[in-house]
Structures are given as C-alpha cells and as structure tokens.
C-alpha cells in the first residue's frame, strides 16, 4: 500500500497464523503505537520504532504518564539513537471516508512501511492495544504495550509529540478553538468553540459532535462528548 492509498486496511492474522511467524529468529523488534484516535479534529498519527540495543534510552514509558517536557526530551533521544523510526498519519478526510479504526490501521501500516523502506526489516512488529494492522511481517497486539514494551513506549512518544506539534500549529491558524490546550479532544471548551465559531476543515465530520454542529442540532444534555467519540485529553 502506498502512502497515499486510502484502501481500507485489513486487520492482521494473529501471530500464530501469520505466514511470517517463526521463519527467522526474532531479533529486530518494531514497536508501533498511535495518537489521536479520540479527538474531534486533526489526523490520527502513528509511529514505528526499532530501538538500537547498543544505544539504550533511559526513562521510556507510556507517553500518557510523562510530562510534555520529558516527552520532548525523549523524542530527541529516540530519533537520534533508534536503529530506525518513522511517523505517519491518516488524514481527516481518510478518517471520515473509512472510519477511525481503519484509518488508525492505515497510519500504522504506513509507519511500519516507512521503517522497512529504510532497510530495517522487523522480525516482529509489536502493536499497542488489541488489534493489529496487516503488514508484511509477523505482528502481535499487546494490551498496555506502551507501558510494557520499550519500543512501543518509544513509538507512543514519537506519535504523541508529533501530533501535539501539529495541533499547536493548527492553533496558530485557528486560535479561537484552543487546539493548543485540548489537542482537538471534545472538551467543554472545544464544544463551545464549535458552537460559537462553526466547524473548520480540520474537524472530523464523521464524529457525532461535529456532525451535530453541521446539522444545526443542539448538543446533548450535559454537553459531554460520548465515550464512543472521544477519550480524555490524556488518552493517547
């Protein structure tokens, strides 16, 4: 699949059924994670990282438990020391066209393809969560992998820092929405800004609060975003 493809990606076979499983000793591990599944605006971002065992990185952890300052410092160290890394995304248009789950898988596919394009071919791709994208390598899902597997922790940091930077840039273009504060998540501040200023081209029209705003419907009682549409601002 090319970087511009919007073909709906298939979920991977479980590791035991993957044709690549068991063919080689697993020495090159590639961690994969995403940021931005839940927000009402902006792309969904994914990163793939192959760490260099000869250049250990101290302090790797789930990006959600790190301060922004610590994430930025680790980002610089990861891109300097990793054997290979790549950050990719699926656009708002792709999210609306194929849904957020498939768009997330697409971004992950692109991230792994970016690592492979550097000549680093993983023996095993380890993905945070309970679903895997279909890639040309053995792959396994690890629930809470961003807290358990260093390469996934590194990927979570690259994905989150990249997406936070994108939303900070979006704030400069649309300061009235407060993207620098909520990163596109459905906070009361963001919902109020949508009601007051309308929807930007960067909002996900397939998400219910945005769709309601476009239809002119009032927000539901309590003015809260349903959990099916968004997670908290610290969830990625």
Curated annotation (Swiss-Prot):
Q: Which InterPro entries match?
A: RNase_HII (IPR022898), RNase_HII/HIII (IPR001352), RNase_HII/HIII_dom (IPR024567), RNaseH-like_sf (IPR012337), RNaseH_sf (IPR036397)
Report the subcellular localization. Cytoplasm
Catalytic activity, EC:
3.1.26.4
Task: Classify the source by domain of life.
Answer: Bacteria
Does the UniProt entry include the keyword Manganese? yes
What chemistry does it catalyse, as a reaction equation? Endonucleolytic cleavage to 5'-phosphomonoester
A Pfam family of the record is RNase_HII
Q: Which residues bind a divalent metal cation?
A: 33-34, 128
Example of a GO biological process term: DNA replication, removal of RNA primer
One term under GO cellular component: ribonuclease H2 complex
Q: Cofactor binding mode, per the note?
A: Manganese or magnesium. Binds 1 divalent metal ion per monomer in the absence of substrate. May bind a second metal ion after substrate binding.
Its keywords, alphabetically, are: Cytoplasm, Endonuclease, Hydrolase, Manganese, Metal-binding, Nuclease
The segment annotated Disordered runs over: 212-236
Report the leader peptide range.
Answer: none
Fetch the PANTHER family from UniProt. Answer: RIBONUCLEASE H2 SUBUNIT A (PTHR10954), RIBONUCLEASE HII (PTHR10954:SF18)
Family assignment? Belongs to the RNase HII family.
Name the chain's protein: Ribonuclease HII
Annotated organism of origin:
Ralstonia nicotianae (strain ATCC BAA-1114 / GMI1000)
């Amino acid at each position: 699949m090319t970087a511009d493809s919007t073909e709906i990606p298939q979920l991977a076979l479980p590791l035991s059924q993957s044709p690549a499983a068991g063919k080689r000793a697993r020495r090159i591990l590639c961690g994969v994670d995403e940021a931005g599944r839940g927000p009402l605006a902006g792309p969904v971002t994914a990163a793939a990282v192959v760490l260099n065992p000869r250049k250990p990185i101290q302090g790797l952890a789930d990006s959600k438990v790190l301060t922004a300052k610590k994430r930025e410092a680790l980002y610089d160290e990861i891109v300097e020391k990793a054997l290979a890394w790549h950050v990719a995304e699926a656009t708002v248009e792709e999210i609306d066209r194929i849904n957020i789950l498939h768009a997330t898988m697409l971004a992950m596919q692109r991230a792994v393809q970016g690592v492979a394009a550097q000549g680093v071919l993983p023996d095993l791709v380890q993905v945070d969560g309970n679903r895997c994208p279909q890639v040309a390598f053995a792959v396994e899902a690890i629930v809470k992998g961003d807290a358990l597997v260093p390469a996934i922790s590194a990927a979570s940091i690259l994905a989150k820092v990249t997406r936070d930077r994108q939303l900070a840039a979006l704030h400069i273009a649309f300061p009235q929405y407060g993207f620098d504060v909520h990163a596109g998540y459905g906070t009361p501040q963001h919902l109020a800004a949508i009601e007051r200023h309308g929807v930007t081209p960067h909002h996900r029209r397939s998400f219910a609060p945005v769709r309601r705003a476009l239809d002119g419907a009032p927000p539901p009682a309590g003015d809260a975003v349903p959990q099916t549409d968004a997670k908290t601002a610290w969830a990625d």
